[in-house]
Curated annotation (Swiss-Prot):
Disulfide bonds: none annotated. GO terms for biological process: post-transcriptional regulation of gene expression; regulation of translation. Keywords: Cytoplasm, Repeat, RNA-binding, Translation regulation. The gene is APUM20. Sequence-specific RNA-binding protein that regulates translation and mRNA stability by binding the 3'-UTR of target mRNAs. Residues 1-332 form the PUM-HD domain. Its main location: cytoplasm. The pumilio repeats mediate the association with RNA by packing together to form a right-handed superhelix that approximates a half donut. The number as well as the specific sequence of the repeats determine the specificity for target mRNAs. This is Putative pumilio homolog 20. It comes from Arabidopsis thaliana (Mouse-ear cress).
């Protein structure tokens, strides 16, 4: 059940207890465990009962005027508080504003002004978190919040990010937002979630970019966790467009390269031949030969691949595997 923020009486002290905010879920998204709960601090607002007397048209006009960028920069603390209250008191209205390009920019300008204003916006963001972080323009509000919010609010945001990480990473706009904040203080926890979902993400049009980003950070612990999650699936991934991108990155460092090549050598000869002629796999088999030939510490890997591929040399010459055939020719 979503909770509405109440407007406190004039000079009412800040209370540390605050109703928990539960998030609605978009259609077609199943969440196996309950969303994280957030207990933001309420803000000491002056009496805004006059808002109830405004017609919808008057309220809309006030909001349009208030959202002017130049006016935002001139607002005092009380007017900022009024502005934030108008924008955040209705979750759906806030979402509508945040999804608008200009609305998103203006909300971002309001963030980081005062802690009380930030408390209102943090609560509003968390009520519609998944909708906001996966939107083209609204996602920038989350990114800005993760830059200017205090530790308590950032922690609440990160709990939601961790909870929805798999959904966010597979969204066109969400994965870009995730990439922007992936190096923050909670990155190890986020990396653990990503590694756990590595197989699903590797096969996804957008999720594979998140896996690539984590791998390229060269965080040994996270890379090992991803390799463990993907072990036994490298051949299957190599046949797929998005999965092949991930395998390509894994072939670039010695430790992960060894695991991938060993798995290639374990597959049946016919399977390796099909991979070598595959639209995506041929490039990876060729790269595996090149990196193992260059890294002669494990000569057994290079010669193992050569011996498995040689029987198919003629088939490879007249297919997508012609570059592989050229390598085999060069070592005769």
């Amino acid at each position: 059940m979503a909770h509405q923020l109440r407007f406190a009486a004039a000079r009412e002290p800040i209370s540390e207890e605050y109703p928990a905010v539960a998030l609605p879920h978009p259609r077609c998204i199943s969440v196996a465990f309950p969303p994280p709960r957030f207990t933001p601090s309420p803000s000491p607002l002056t009496n805004y009962s006059f808002l109830a007397a405004l017609t919808p048209q008057e309220l809309e006009m006030r909001l349009q005027i208030a959202m002017d960028v130049q006016m935002i920069s001139k607002l005092d603390q009380r007017k900022l508080q009024t502005m934030a209250s108008l924008l955040t008191s209705d979750p759906d209205y806030f979402l509508m504003i945040a999804r608008n390009m200009n609305g998103s920019k203006r909300i971002q300008k309001l963030l980081g002004k005062t802690d009380d204003v930030d408390a209102l916006f943090a609560a509003a963001i968390l009520r519609r978190f998944l909708h906001i972080i996966t939107d083209k323009y609204a996602s920038y509000v989350v990114r800005r919040g993760m830059t200017v919010f205090d530790k308590k609010k950032k922690k609440a945001m990160y709990e939601h990010i961790l909870h929805y990480a798999s959904h966010i990473a597979r969204d066109k706009h969400g994965n870009l937002a995730l990439n922007d904040i992936i190096t923050d203080a909670y990155r190890n926890k986020l990396f653990d979630v990503i590694a756990h979902k590595a197989l699903v993400l590797s096969n996804d049009a957008y999720g594979n970019f998140v896996i690539q980003r984590v791998l390229k950070l060269n965080d040994l612990r996270s890379k090992n966790n991803i390799v463990v999650s993907l072990r036994g699936h490298f051949v299957d991934l190599s046949f797929q467009k998005y999965g092949s991108y991930v395998v390509d990155v894994l072939l670039e460092t010695k430790e992960s390269m060894v695991v991938v090549v060993e798995e290639l050598m374990e597959c049946e000869g016919d399977m390796l031949m099909r991979l070598a002629r595959n639209e995506y796999g041929n490039f990876l088999v060729c790269k595996a030969l090149r990196v193992t030939q260059k890294e002669m510490v494990r000569t057994d890997l290079f010669w193992g691949l050569v011996h498995k591929l040689k029987p198919f040399h003629n088939l490879l010459r007249w297919s997508r595997g012609k570059n592989i055939a050229s390598i085999l020719n060069s070592i005769r």
